[in-house]
């Protein structure tokens, strides 16, 4: 098979690590370089590698990550894709030099409307995250009516 064609096929089938928009030590002292190195460099890389090893020859072979998470049944493909998506969202939301410490605009208004205050939101969000046994994810999401919800999910 042509090397260029093979390379293009691998590029289409391969899920890649997101590039961090900051240095691995840029979030210190809130998140240590050791934590970033471990969770980004080891955990996330393992999930990406696992996903790339699992999808060839399946209906998910040429699917994007969101489609895989939305359509794959519980199992190894779903779990690894879910962890890749969750870790990617997690790591890409941070900034070493945030411009403000609280949300503004429409998000701030929605938080005040649905949680009473930003302080109440933080308390509820932290309680949801701390209430997870083992590994998992706490998310702020919005429903089709625009109402904010805190959800938590174990693992992927």
Question: Where in the sequence are the language-model features?
Answer:
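Positively charged n-region of N-terminal signal peptides that target proteins for export
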Residues: 1-4
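Feature for soluble, non-membrane regions of globular proteins
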Residues: 6-8, 12-156
């Amino acid at each position: 098979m042509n090397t260029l064609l093979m390379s293009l096929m691998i590029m289409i089938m391969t899920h890649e690590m997101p590039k961090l928009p900051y240095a691995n030590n840029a979030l210190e002292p809130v998140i240590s370089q050791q934590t970033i190195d471990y969770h980004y460099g080891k955990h996330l890389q393992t999930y990406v590698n696992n996903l790339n090893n699992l999808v060839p020859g399946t209906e998910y072979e040429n699917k994007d990550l969101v489609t895989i998470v939305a359509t794959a049944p519980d199992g190894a493909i779903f779990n690894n894709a879910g962890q890749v998506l969750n870790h990617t969202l997690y790591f890409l939301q941070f900034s070493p030099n945030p411009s403000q410490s609280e949300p503004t605009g429409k998000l701030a208004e929605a938080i005040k409307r649905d949680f009473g205050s930003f302080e109440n939101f933080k308390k509820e969000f932290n309680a949801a995250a701390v209430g997870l046994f083992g590994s998992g994810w706490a998310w702020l999401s919005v429903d089709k009516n625009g109402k904010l919800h805190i959800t938590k999910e174990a693992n992927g």
